[in-house]
Amino acid sequence: MSSNVIKLGTAALLLGTLAAIPVARAQWFGGKDAKAVPVQDVTDMLHAVMAADRAVYTQRVVNRLQNEEKVITADEHFGDKKALPLPAQMFRFGAEKVAESTTKFSYSLLSLWPVNRQNAPRTAMEKEGLKFVAENSGKNFYGEETLGGKKYFTAVYADVAVSPACVSCHNGHPDSPRTDFKLKDVMGGVVIRVPTN
Amino acid sequence: MGIPRTLMLWLLWIALTVPIGLVVLAVVVYGGNRSFLLIGKTTSGHHQIELACDACHTSLFGGREVLHDACVNCHGAELRAANDTHPKSKFTDPRNADRVAILDARNCVTCHQEHRPRITRAMGVTLPDDLCFNCHQEIASERPSHRGLAFTSCASAGCHNFHDNRALYEDFLNKHAGQPAQLESQRVALADFLKSRDNAIRVARPLGPADADAPAAHAGDAAILADWAADAHAGAGINCTGCHTGKAEPERWIAVPGIASCRNCHANEVRTFTEGKHGMRLREDLMATREGPFGLFTASTLAQMTPAEARLPMKRDAAHNSLGCGSCHSAHRYDTTFARAEACAGCHDDPHTKAYFASPHYTLFKREAAGLAPRGTGVSCATCHMPATEVRASDGSRSAYATHNQNDNLRPNEKMVRSVCANCHGLQFALDALADPKLIADNFKGLSSVHVESIEWAQRRLRERSNRRAQGAPQ
């Protein structure tokens, strides 16, 4: 009897030890991983900053100076025309700067109705994500895709017309494939990618 | 019993190979005559500096990334100024991974390989000229005007460039559509601004021969003093010691002041001079040989360029001139009229240069030089190849200088449209002229036999979009 108890106790101890190994390993050797922020939270946080900066530039700079006070215009060829860069260009310039400094993430502003055809969705996930955020108000799209042999966590966030400047510019641009945008409409999406391998 | 024959041979092989290998390695690392290392004829853009191997091969173990960084080190600022249409960041974006798999445009060396003369085309491009097709297959459906065009025609004059499209984008074409060949006002950019700047640096009392402060041992003859006194330097209060002595050793007389002296006051001109083909060997960081161990290698820079080493036709009697500031600007008579045209023709002997002196541009230049026409109306070699460049400081203040990098706007030649041609000519006239090689060889005497259609296409597309929009149809 006592022999069986000892055997059972030993087995339980052994199993318990085996079960504890991954936890201990994570605690002692993989503390950084254990405390790592989930990648979805990372993209959500990145997007919060991007969306805030984008809204501030669009509303407090472009819409105020161009549409309300009419002191300067915003133009695609802002250098030649001594104008402000368009909000989409500001966003893209930021993305290019980030791309010069890190490969830990990348982002772009895309649309199912792009003024510049280069900003139409290219990957299957971009198409799916942009369609999802356009049809599901207030919801984000998350997925995983493999591009160039690398795996990415891909998040798509709706890009909404936050000011009259967005609507008037896109509806009036000769290259815009859609001319019936209204304030608060989803005009496209911010796609953020984080490599996962 | 002697040493076995095989062992003898091994020892002999080692005794020969190791020293030879060390010598080669030392030459690779430190310098010397490295011409035996060249694996193929260097492009015209780099042949002058081909023996300063580490200008591009900055690491012995570097691959494409190292070479790319070296390209950007010299050409990065130029690409940024040109609003590069295909920056690296466009291709590091994962969404373009499929495109990169076909054409890795993240690195300069994908399209511009050095030492590959058999596949090198204009501007050092080593890819076939249908490279645009790799990413832009849909262009015919997006732009009906482009249907049926050859895939090799994208970069034809007046259409598209890979990097610099500042004079070719659609809005620019539309904005300048319908301009006359000869604009109402025909003056070079910044002519008045440069004149006001020149006046600003004149001192209240210009220096004269009696003011010369050269020590008696180095006093020049009367002709030198007269040249200097009539020169802009004396007018600006720059005395003999201003150029013939340096800050580090003010007592030491510099018999022949070099580029370093000029740089003290003319930093932009000297910088751009060392960016172009005339002065690229004088870039501060270029070394023919670097300091080596045991005094075996002594640091030395590249020798100044000579016309004999040029790949363009040059005059035989100028073959051994060396190219520094004084080549075009004589030491004591800073004659900009001479420097702007005759100095060029002193060495260059190609059809374009020779034809200049029978061209309408030269007629205008002579009239301005003779005081018969307003400043800025003459067109010299420098007007087109060394145009005035405006610089704006972060506080908004303006300055301007004549770029001394004569390659800056040379190729693709549409780069010249904005900085030069558009000051006097309509865009259509300029694009047509720049697309006609024979007219260029004749130095623009006559009219172009080539017509570039890009403005008409842009105009047609503008009308079509307006019509569709007026009818409420999707674009």
Q: Residues of each region from the PLM?
A:
Chain A
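The canonical Cys-X-X-Cys-His
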Residues: V162-P174
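Bacterial N-terminal signal peptides
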Residues: A11-A20
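Extracytoplasmic c-type cytochrome modules immediately beyond a signal peptide or single-pass transmembrane anchor
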Residues: A24-A161, D175-N197
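Bacterial N-terminal signal peptides that target proteins for export
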Residues: M1-A12
